[in-house]
């Protein structure tokens, strides 16, 4: 049974709920800037994360604590985990989220299990029998297409993917070199987005040229360029484009590039540490190009006050958030985008901006005002007054501060009590384990007779004495009291690999990464010794300063929201560098994937209807195309009667296997029977019941009761009643490979298009819908020779 339920909102944020044979799978619990997630109908058993932006992970932390998702397995790629952590921390600070802390985010993301690309993972427990595999999506660093396989059901979840290469990413694994990846071809159910199905995007070269042209035009006129960006995903592509252009320009450009985000420095550091996840061009140049991903022309700023040190003049500012309704991008809009008409707000992403957001309103204004004579219209002037909501943070005072302190005091007391109780229970458990192990050793000594020796002699101490076990229980229960301080030495835990250690005891003290270099050369020399190395005291001072900055952020404060009317006077433009497919590629690739069921999500109603209409016009494509509404449950199970059977040993020995691709198949005549345990198995079960685990024995018993056995036919009556079938040809012939085989045999072959291969000028091999192949031609030796080559390319079962 395979059910799908769409829980996404109008802004394309939300969760996909898949129920596969009783396993509840939630994919991409996204949210908007509020970081809230709606209540879900069922508790998840498995959570999968595709990308690291808010639309795919924004609601994870909220739902993890609010709806108690702590028992679910969470899987993602390593870049999605690291960049997703940065995205959440940026959103918390930009939106002044008070009910969510950095510790909450770290606890959730530390519980995520990392996966590598094309690493099949067989799950256990409640998800037993389910295999998940991650494939490159090409949209974000670590972005994922998820393949789910359980018995006869196969699901491909492909949302937000990009088939073309970026500056720092490869294209999606779904479509490479003009072919669909064999492992992702013909799934039972394909869940994908119809985003941009109505749009034809210009070539990447044209878009990059228009992007640089617009940026440089504004800078040369004395304007400032504002690029609203996300915190940790597509911003890396913009950094690559800008840094490459600044590095290649001669003479060097005098315009600074600023990356404004509370997590900008850590985002760049994470990107440098995950080069193996990037595109082939990045991996190829690693170790050769010293400036690879150094972004020497980009200054990271984590505090808005540092902008005052830059000074006036043209500059490029990449600032979070995308919507212009919070974060540094809103503050830049308020402070800088109302004075100079040469200033430019350049949008590069649209699908992540909600319909009612300020960014989306500006993009729609640009579309109405621009002339559509060019592929990429020029910027247009925006002169308007706009009402915006501004959040400010003010420290608590008076009665509010006292109430806050009382609440925090009660929380700390409760946390201390819980910690003490947990420590006490753990200590009791350790003592019980220690006493039980010692009592087992004592029990072994009871049956051994010891010769009479003097009490206290070395012979008595070295031997085994019955008197040693006669201990008073009251005395044994007393604990040792320490007069100086209550230090309790913890038990050393040892497993098969050795002693278990704490990694934090051996961690190195790393020097904090530098952000914007505001000091001049003389200050830098003063901070260095003669060898040019930092002193240990300076590193400690830096760590202490960092700690003080974190403490400043923890000052009790309240959030005040005011509505203010601002004046905007600047240029506006949208250039698509979002890294997503367009309508042409979508309508070309999806028919080649050729799924048995297609579910369209993550797009507007017009885009989904257009994609459905395109699929309906294809004669060889499935007619089972679904567009689910919010909360609607649709059944996308395939019409296959699949059963789990156990093959008898005698049957396996006589099977003849034929290799088909990476698999082997065999034809058999067998009979399904209910297994009856033999006398030896009964005796073995009795021994296991006495010595083994009760739960394990019950599982084995249920498995034997539920799995019938497939036995070979031995009776003549069974053989006479068995159905007879013609030989079955199994496999997939590619006409290009067949053409090569024909040419090797000296037979001319020419591809005529539309799945037709003309052989020897007289025989045509045609691929039909449904995987059928026809060989047409006059009966001759050449016809049978070609047919034999076709048979040889298939497995006869």
From Swiss-Prot:
GO-annotated molecular function: RNA binding
Pfam families: Beta-Casp, CPSF100_C, Lactamase_B_6, RMMBL
Entry keywords, A to Z: mRNA processing, Nucleus
Taxonomy, superkingdom: Eukaryota
Region (Disordered): 519-557, 677-703
Keyword Nucleus: yes
Biological process according to GO: co-transcriptional mRNA 3'-end processing, cleavage and polyadenylation pathway
Subcellular location(s) per record: Nucleus
SUPFAM superfamilies hit by this protein: Metallo-hydrolase/oxidoreductase
Principal place of residence: nucleus
Composition bias type Basic and acidic residues, residue spans: 684-703
Gene Ontology cellular component annotations, sorted alphabetically: mRNA cleavage and polyadenylation specificity factor complex; nucleus
Purpose: RNA-binding component of the cleavage and polyadenylation factor (CPF) complex, which plays a key role in polyadenylation-dependent pre-mRNA 3'-end formation and cooperates with cleavage factors including the CFIA complex and NAB4/CFIB. May be involved in poly(A)-site recognition. May be involved in the association of the CPF, CPFIA and RNA polymerase II complexes.
Subunit text: Component of the cleavage and polyadenylation factor (CPF) complex, which is composed of cft1, cft2, ysh1, pta1, swd2, pfs2, dis2, yth1, ssu72, and fip1.
Name of the protein in question: Cleavage factor two protein 2
Organism encoding this protein: Schizosaccharomyces pombe (strain 972 / ATCC 24843)
Gene: cft2
